[in-house]
From Swiss-Prot:
GO terms for biological process: cytoplasmic translation. It comes from Aeropyrum pernix (strain ATCC 700893 / DSM 11879 / JCM 9820 / NBRC 100138 / K1). GO terms for cellular component: cytosolic large ribosomal subunit. It comes from the Archaea. This is Large ribosomal subunit protein uL22. The gene is rpl22. Part of the 50S ribosomal subunit. Keywords: Ribonucleoprotein, Ribosomal protein, RNA-binding, rRNA-binding. CDD domains: Ribosomal_L22. One of its GO terms (molecular function) is structural constituent of ribosome.
Length: 156
């Protein structure tokens, strides 16, 4: 059995709420870009931003996984980087994670209105190996990569 933990160790966790989602069916590269975009935001601000991403009103800047990606209007002004996408599926899972961490914060008697994201990360999860049959008896691998997402918030 694997041993799960967080990638950040804190001395005092009394003012911090944590949450994690395991085996999310989104590639870790995409989840890492969404995590980088919301890192340091307040929870309500991150929620508004992710809803705008789902509605395709705001794009997420893709700084690492951006090969042959289009430039998006307004990204360079806000983020200083013109290349971006609208990762709707990743934003939905990140919203679910924000709901979880907000509930955990309420359970620890933290003020939900004043929560700020201090850490968010995406790590590689399991890979489901599949094979797609091709012509002449060949087969091509079709791997489905999953992600683990973790988040920590603190009351400010």
């Amino acid at each position: 059995m694997p041993r799960w933990g967080y990638s950040v160790k804190l001395r005092d966790e009394s003012e911090v709420a944590k949450a994690v989602l395991r085996n999310v069916p989104v590639h870790p590269k995409i989840m890492a870009e969404v995590a980088r975009a919301i890192s340091g935001m307040r929870v309500d601000e991150a929620r508004r931003y992710l809803r705008a991403v789902i509605e395709k009103r705001e794009a997420v800047p893709f700084r690492r996984a951006h090969g042959k990606q289009a430039h998006r209007r307004g990204l360079a002004d806000k983020w200083g980087w013109p290349v971006g996408r609208y990762p709707v599926k990743a934003a939905r899972y990140m919203l679910k994670l924000l709901d979880n961490v907000e509930a955990n914060a309420a359970n620890k008697n933290l003020d939900v209105e004043r929560l700020k994201i201090i850490h968010v990360a995406a790590h590689k999860g399991i890979t489901l190996k599949r094979w797609m049959p091709r012509a002449w008896g060949r087969a091509t691998p079709r791997n489905r990569v999953h992600s683990h997402i973790e988040i920590m918030v603190r009351e400010v």
